[in-house]
Amino acid sequence: MRAILLAAGFGTRLRPMTDSTPKCLVPINGKPLLQIWLERLTADGIGPFLVNTHYLSEQVEQFIKESEFRDQVEIVYEPKLLGTGGTLIKNIEFFQGKDGLLIHADNYCLADFNAFIVAHENRPNICKMTMMTFLTDDPSSCGIVEIDEEGIVIGFREKVEQPPSNFANGAIYILSHDLIELVASKFNKILELDY
């Protein structure tokens, strides 16, 4: 399964640490976060990868160039940040019409990706995407997912005082090939725009 790793953000909440280091290269136990992602995903049989860059992009490009993953990673520089949806739309053909992962690579995650893929394969038929969630003790501090009794997302609430649950959006998604084709067909005009 192919994966797009979103790594273009400014990392403003981690300043001053990110004043000179992109958030995806901030070390955790001495290892850059992006390296942790690439190692974990590769170990689970996931790849190749597309990594978008913007802020301090030269550092990310240099890291990939010097890494063991250089042949598995396509780097796409965004002169203007496109956001999650914009990056997906602009690079939709990367998935080659198959199910694919979309990951905010500036987050740290210890989840079992094989189990996540199995959950996606066994999702209800009406679901076109599987979203990783996590339980939070402070639901008013993050984006909360509202789900029905079948585990289907029915709403989102962003940092509200009275959140409907404590399931937080983990910013990791598996997109079905059906959804990828739908996005490609509905937004093909946007794909032609010069960003």
Where are these regions (language model features)?
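Conserved N-terminal catalytic core of the sugar/cofactor nucleotidyltransferase
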Residues: 2-5, 27, 31-104, 108, ...
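A structural signal for short hydrophobic beta-strand segments in well-ordered beta-sheet cores
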Residues: 25, 145-147
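Active-site glycine-centered loops adjacent to acidic/histidine catalytic or metal-binding residues
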Residues: 9, 106, 135
